[in-house]
Every structure is written in C-alpha cells, then in structure tokens.
Amino acid sequence: VEDTEISDAHAIFELNFFGALNMIKEVVPVMRECGGGTIINISSVAAELAIPFQSFYSATKAALSSLSSALRGELAPFGIKVCAILPGDVKTDFTSSRRKNACDNSAYGDRVTRSVAVMEKDERNGLPPRAIARIAVKLASHKNPPVKVAGGRKYALFLFLNRILPARLVSYILAKMYA
C-alpha cells in the first residue's frame, strides 16, 4: 500500500470495477426489454483469498463479486441472472505487463520481489484463457447459474477450504505463500 500511488489505485478500480459497472449499466435496460439474460462478471479467487502485495487488485475483485451478488437479487424480477467467475492463475499477457510498485528503497522490497516471482510462476503455469471462456459459455446457457463459480477444480478447492478453515490459518498460509 505504501509504495502504490493513489492514482494507480484509482486506475485499477476504474478498470476492474467501474469498467464492468459501466458495461452493466449499458446492458441492463436492453436485457430488461428483451425479457432477461445473463450477466457474467470475471472476478478472481483473489476476491475471497486476498493476496499480499496485490491488495488493490484483490479489493477490486472483491467489489466486483459483491456487486454481482447484490445485482443478482435486484435484477432477478426482470429475468436477468448475474454470476461471477473467480479464476485463479490464468496464462495471459498480464504476467509480462504487471507493474511492480515497490521502490528500490522500499521496506517491502525483497518480499514484493519474491511474491511477484511466485505469482508470475503460477500464472505461467495457469489455466489457458479458453478454460475460463468455456465456464462462461456454460454459465450463459445454464437455467439457474450459481452466483459464484471457481475457475477450475483447484480453485474450487481453495475457495472451499477458505470457507471451512479459520481465517487466521488462511491468512497465515497466504502470507507464507506470497509474503
């Protein structure tokens, strides 16, 4: 947090949250007129398992997941279903284009470097984007899709464990993995 400019925090919220919100605001009136449809938001496992040194990314995805849950109830009377896919690591150009915010003299320097290295390795070995697209297609044709769907079995297990394990233990594990 200390090494991130507020303008960078605004930018990631603008992209990950407000970008989706703007699209939703445009499609909802059309969907209402057409008698329904399905809105599928791409959130992240990080929405529920907040990743150290990815605090703003995690926060944007948590906001998007919460929006999806709330809209589901608001839009249901119009036949509009809302769900969120929570992928984990996906092989995309995001890995190579990630901005590293830690300053050379940062108190977090080595920890951020290690954390980013772990994330980049996981992303290079992640799911292909096509796997997430398949989940979206399946949700779009589902009569009553779930509110949230993990992006793959591995992440479904992580989300399940997050629900049953004590929060302190989950935080400890995430800190060991990423901090």
What are these regions (language model features)?
Residues 72-123:
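C-terminal beta-strand-loop-alpha-helix "lid" module of Rossmann-like NAD(P)-dependent dehydrogenases
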Residues 44:
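Residue(s) in the substrate-gating loop at a strand-loop-helix junction
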Residues 24, 60-63:
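Active-site helix of classical SDR
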Residues 84, 106-155:
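C-terminal helical subdomain
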Residues 23-27, 41, 67-68:
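Hydrophobic positions on the long internal alpha-helix
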Residues 2, 49-55:
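Active-site loop immediately N-terminal to the catalytic Tyr-X3-Lys motif
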Residues 1, 8-10:
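Substrate-binding pocket helix/loop in short-chain dehydrogenase/reductase
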